[in-house]
């Protein structure tokens, strides 16, 4: 099985009405944990890499690691995705290193801190789409800024996130504007703002429609029934792993993530890609703490890393099952990037027209 583009994978997910978790990766242990879970679940995989991860691990190391994972798990369709690209160069160098998909986040300017206006977002996202599609790579865009509807603030992740406070209109994607954006940029997937944010501290209470606007997804799907919607900041921050973390010396304050059942609801309304990072970090860190606390003489890193990998795999398997991803890897016949490039050039992959409100 070869590497798969995000567009082909999400097209398949739409045809079969499932969602695909996109797990952030920094190192070998995360990669092995995710791929083992995928093999056990017969699930296709999206491994995504932030700019911070590229800086931490180095592009050469990441590229070789992805090659190794592809070779070790030949039956798993593997999409390699740049998360939150901040400029054209970030996206193109990712493709240069073997990524099959990139996100151009034009909701913020190049500093990844300053909210951008609509015209800037359209201009830079359309340029990345034009260039990426020439070589068959997929593009995800973002409209609206990720941040909390409770506080108006965002949470920076690897240096990416707006500073200060925004009003509610800036923190929610407008469905009509979304229809224009997809038509003007040609993106393959659209990340929307609905009140989720990066990191562990998303909500101070179990989220309701007041702070997690799932109705926005339904309205966008109604306007854009053929567009693949992406939910960012969608870790569920499992209570059981919070408890393990704190039971063994951690100091995580009370917090709530995005409930799995709400994500499943989103999948019914066009959500095809679900970004998850904190859940794997938390599971791994909790497993580390448990070993350090219960085996205080232990100093072999493998004795810490193996339980951490098992913990991450368990989270991945649960998400593959809940989102309906399980059982679909073996159903996919990968289309090579040169063929995807030909299809883009022919216009056959052009976004479908939005459904009008009157329709």
From Swiss-Prot:
The active site is at 83 (proton donor). Keywords: Calvin cycle, Glycolysis, Lyase, Metal-binding, Plasmid, Zinc. Gene3D superfamilies: Aldolase class I. InterPro entries: Aldolase_TIM, Class_II_FBP_aldolase, FBA_II, Fruct_bisP_Calv. SUPFAM superfamilies: Aldolase. It catalyses: beta-D-fructose 1,6-bisphosphate = D-glyceraldehyde 3-phosphate + dihydroxyacetone phosphate. Its cofactor is Zn(2+). Dihydroxyacetone phosphate binds at residues 199, 233-235, 275-278. Pathway: Carbohydrate biosynthesis; Calvin cycle; Carbohydrate degradation; glycolysis; D-glyceraldehyde 3-phosphate and glycerone phosphate from D-glucose: step 4/4. Binds 2 Zn(2+) ions per subunit. One is catalytic and the other provides a structural contribution. It comes from the Bacteria. One of its GO terms (molecular function) is fructose-bisphosphate aldolase activity. GO terms for biological process: glycolytic process; reductive pentose-phosphate cycle. Zn(2+) 1 binds at residues 84, 198, 232. Its EC number is 4.1.2.13. Zn(2+) 2 binds at residues 105, 142. NCBIfam families: cbbA (TIGR00167), FruBisAldo_II_B (TIGR01521). Belongs to the class II fructose-bisphosphate aldolase family. Catalyzes the aldol condensation of dihydroxyacetone phosphate (DHAP or glycerone-phosphate) with glyceraldehyde 3-phosphate (G3P) to form fructose 1,6-bisphosphate (FBP) in gluconeogenesis and the reverse reaction in glycolysis. Homodimer. This is Fructose-bisphosphate aldolase.
């Amino acid at each position: 099985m070869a590497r798969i583009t995000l567009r082909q994978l999400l097209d398949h997910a739409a045809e079969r009405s499932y969602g695909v978790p996109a797990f952030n990766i920094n190192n070998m242990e995360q990669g092995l944990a995710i791929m083992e879970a995928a093999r056990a679940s017969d699930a296709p995989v999206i491994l995504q890499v932030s700019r911070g991860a590229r800086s931490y691990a180095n592009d050469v190391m990441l590229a070789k690691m992805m090659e190794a994972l592809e070779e070790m798990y030949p039956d798993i369709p593997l999409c390699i995705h740049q998360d939150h690209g901040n400029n054209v160069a970030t996206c193109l160098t990712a493709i240069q290193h073997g990524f099959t998909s990139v996100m151009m986040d034009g909701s913020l300017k190049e500093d990844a801190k300053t909210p951008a206006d609509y015209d800037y977002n359209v201009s830079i996202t359309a340029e990345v789409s034009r260039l990426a599609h020439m070589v068959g790579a997929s593009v995800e865009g973002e409209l609206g800024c990720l941040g909390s509807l409770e506080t108006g603030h965002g949470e920076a992740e690897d240096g990416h996130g707006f500073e200060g406070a925004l009003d509610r209109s800036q923190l929610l994607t407008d469905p009509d504007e979304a229809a224009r954006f997809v038509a003007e940029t040609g993106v393959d997937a659209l990340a929307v703002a609905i009140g989720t944010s990066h990191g562990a501290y998303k909500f101070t209470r179990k989220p309701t429609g007041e702070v997690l606007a799932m109705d926005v997804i339904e309205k966008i799907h109604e306007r854009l029934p053929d567009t693949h919607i992406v939910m960012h900041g969608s870790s569920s921050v499992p209570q059981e792993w919070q408890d393990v973390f704190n039971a063994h010396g951690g100091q995580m304050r009370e917090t709530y993530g995005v409930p799995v059942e709400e994500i499943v609801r989103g999948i019914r309304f066009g959500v095809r890609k679900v970004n998850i990072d904190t859940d794997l970090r938390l599971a791994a860190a909790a497993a580390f703490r448990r070993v350090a606390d219960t085996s205080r003489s232990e100093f072999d890193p493998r004795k810490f890393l193996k339980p951490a990998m098992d913990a991450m795999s368990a989270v991945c398997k649960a998400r593959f099952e809940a989102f309906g991803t399980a059982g679909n890897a073996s159903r996919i016949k990968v289309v090579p990037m040169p063929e995807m490039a030909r299809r883009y050039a022919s216009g056959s992959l052009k976004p479908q027209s939005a459904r009008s409100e009157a329709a």
